[in-house]
Amino acid sequence: MSSRLKIVTIGPFPPLRGGISDFHESLVAQLSKKNDVSVLNFKSLYPKILFPGKSQYTEYKNTSDSVETILNPLNILSWFKGSHFIKKKNPDKLIISYWSFFFIPIYMFLLGSIKKGHRYVLFHNVISHENRIFEKFFLKLFIKKIDRCIVMNKYNEKLILQINPKA
């Protein structure tokens, strides 16, 4: 009997550029050593008009069969494709990379694809750098839907507990 867990991770992954994408790639490499990991990646993160840099992409070509690049936060049809992917994989754990409340709608939708007790969110930033109006309200709703919050420092832990003391 295998003790390997089936894990689906959701978040930016190369060829999308940026620190969170690079972190996600490293996380998947480590988790894959002892687990069966599939990645649900974004086709794009933001509309071109909102993207602050030259390009969202690097020259990196991902050759992994475990990466499914279908999500677009502004295309609801991609949300259904992502949900289907999660249900088909039937993972033991779902790990979402969170860094901006812009992604809360798609993430809340995708959380409905897996039963409670298996929903983990890795918070890179609890409060986005822009600190938008209503951000804490939506974060509170989001945190209620997840089973485990993973933070990288005490500051983010404190923010999560201020938003939802039961987290």
Where are these regions (language model features)?
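Active-site proximal beta-strand in glycosyltransferases
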Residues: 93-95, 111-129
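A short, glycine/small-residue-rich beta-strand->loop->alpha-helix junction that serves as a flexible
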Residues: 11-25, 47, 99-104
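A short, active-site helix/loop in glycosyltransferases that binds the activated sugar's phosphate group
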Residues: 146-167
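N-terminal strand-loop element at the rim of the active site
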Residues: 13-17, 29-86, 156, 161
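Short N-terminal targeting/anchoring amphipathic segment
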Residues: 67-73, 81-105, 118-120, 148
